């Protein structure tokens, strides 16, 4: 354990964090840190859920604040490292109960019912790790389900997929048993964190708030559709557009986790109104929904404000080097602009540790295009220093919520060119104004390097337009996205759920 364990028996607010704070830099982690530090009168607990312990051996970027009294970490896929079970499988399992639990999950996915408060899913579909690895009843049940599958995948792939789905749930049971008592549960996502929150809400009889920074099920669907680790055979037998059974099984699993969390949540917070239809489609109830935009400490970015002529001929993409940020489109955009004879430099500012394979692919692309002299991977840097220097920031993502990097750019008076994802259109053009009336940058389609290059060039080549966007950016962030506004909204929310 890189972080010291803290073991208080109670907490005012228990944060349930999957793959974010304190190990991974990014917008959600920054939000977590600011929530903890913004409420010094509250005592916090943290349950961190990671993938495998080996993924978190590097330094910890976020030290625990003094008002964090409980900290525990669990690694969801460490159970996969061992084939030996430490306990004993039961001689007979209630196959009907297991079957009913799976039917209940399917009904939940179809929106046909709600899970019982005492759902067997809380006990991992009624199957312990020892049962899964050592029970003939579980083996026979898996065989029965397998023969019912149309266009069957290889059984070995089916078995390991099902085991991989169950393994994190066995780990979550440990977190469930060890968690401290708390007044409020707060999870910034559905997924495993939201699922654990739903179970804890029932066990501790306390309210769960899900504060979504992106639609977890949507992002996992994108990841799974792009994933190369899911083995697919007989691809030529599938209809066009048909998703392989195992890939769809994973998608359904994460959709179920999301619906389960939505059902048990007292409040479901979103960052902007445009995401509400997706939340409703995912099983949220309209009466639970609440919009609280991100906010930042605007004053801290004032020193970065300066006119275009005092800035370097550079644009920056501030974000993690991961597929969902579509760094490759940014690199291809740099290539198009370099072909025009521009001397602009393109900075990629963010951690490359989360997906080292993708980072390597991006580096190969830079070398293949001969862009080593103008595309630079800077790693983590002071955002204030970067925003003091660059002329534009760029967001090439294929999915976002309400990106903190855009708000920080605005606070520094730096216009933004962004893909049309999440709240970015609302941020750049304003929620109530007509498109182009008071722009703080330019919106472009996803995965469109020519459009991205044209937008960057349009702002770099027109100082008057750049200055107009810069002024609009500052006005918008100062009036609508102040950190103090966000804190006040959360303070009211905490008080409301505590008294209901």
Task: State what each model feature region is.
Residues 237-244, 359-380:
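Nucleotide-activated donor-binding/catalytic signature segment of Leloir-type glycosyltransferases, i.e.
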Residues 340, 345-372, 465:
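Short, structured helix-loop element that forms part of the nucleotide-activated donor/catalytic region
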Residues 398:
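Aromatic "clamp/platform" in nucleotide-sugar-dependent glycosyltransferases that forms part
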Residues 440, 451, 458, 465-480, ...:
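A short, well-ordered alpha-helix in the C-terminal region of glycosyltransferases
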């Amino acid at each position: 354990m890189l972080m010291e364990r803290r073991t208080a028996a109670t907490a005012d607010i228990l944060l349930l964090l999957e793959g974010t704070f304190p190990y991974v830099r990014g917008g959600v982690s920054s939000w977590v840190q600011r929530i903890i530090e913004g409420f010094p009168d509250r005592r916090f607990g943290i349950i961190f859920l990671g993938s495998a312990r080996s993924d978190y051996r590097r330094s910890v970027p976020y030290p625990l604040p003094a008002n964090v009294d409980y900290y525990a970490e669990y690694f969801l896929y460490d159970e996969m490292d061992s084939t030996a079970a430490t306990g004993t499988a039961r001689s007979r399992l209630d196959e009907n109960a297991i079957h009913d639990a799976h039917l209940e999950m399917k009904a939940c996915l179809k929106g046909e019912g709600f899970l019982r408060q005492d759902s067997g899913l809380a006990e991992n579909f009624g199957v312990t790790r020892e049962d899964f690895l050592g029970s003939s009843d579980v083996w026979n049940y898996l065989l029965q389900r397998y023969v019912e599958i149309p266009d069957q995948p290889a059984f070995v792939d089916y078995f390991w997929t099902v085991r991989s789905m169950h393994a994190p749930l066995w780990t979550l049971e440990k977190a469930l048993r060890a968690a401290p008592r708390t007044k409020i549960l707060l999870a910034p996502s559905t997924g495993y964190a939201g699922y654990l929150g739903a179970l804890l809400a029932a066990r501790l009889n306390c309210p769960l708030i899900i504060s979504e920074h992106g639609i977890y099920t949507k992002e996992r669907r994108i990841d799974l559709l792009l994933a190369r680790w899911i083995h697919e055979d007989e691809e030529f037998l599938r209809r066009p557009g048909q998703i392989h059974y195992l890939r769809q099984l994973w998608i359904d699993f994460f959709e179920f986790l999301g619906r389960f969390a939505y059902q048990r949540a007292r409040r479901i917070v979103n960052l902007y109104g445009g995401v509400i239809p997706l939340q409703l489609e995912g099983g949220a109830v309209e009466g639970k929904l609440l919009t609280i935009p991100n906010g930042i400490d605007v004053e801290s970015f004032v020193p970065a404000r300066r006119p275009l002529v005092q800035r370097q001929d550079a644009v920056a993409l501030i974000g993690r080097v991961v597929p969902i940020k579509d760094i490759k489109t940014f690199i291809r955009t740099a290539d198009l602009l370099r072909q025009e004879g521009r001397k602009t430099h393109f900075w990629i500012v963010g951690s490359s540790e989360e997906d080292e394979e993708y980072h390597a692919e991006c580096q190969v692309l830079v070398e293949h295009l001969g862009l080593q002299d103008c595309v630079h991977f800077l790693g983590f840097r002071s955002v204030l220093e970067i925003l003091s220097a660059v002329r534009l920031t760029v967001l090439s993502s294929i999915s976002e919520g309400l990106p903190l990097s855009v708000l920080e750019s605005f606070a520094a008076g730096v216009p933004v060119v962004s893909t049309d994802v999440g709240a970015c259109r609302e941020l750049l053009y304003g929620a109530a104004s007509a498109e182009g009336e008071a722009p703080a940058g330019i919106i472009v389609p996803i995965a469109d390097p020519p459009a991205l290059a044209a937008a960057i060039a349009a702002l770099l080549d027109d100082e008057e337009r750049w200055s107009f966007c810069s002024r609009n950016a500052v006005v918008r962030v100062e009036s609508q996205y102040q950190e103090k506004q966000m804190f006040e909204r959360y303070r009211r929310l905490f008080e409301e759920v505590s008294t209901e």
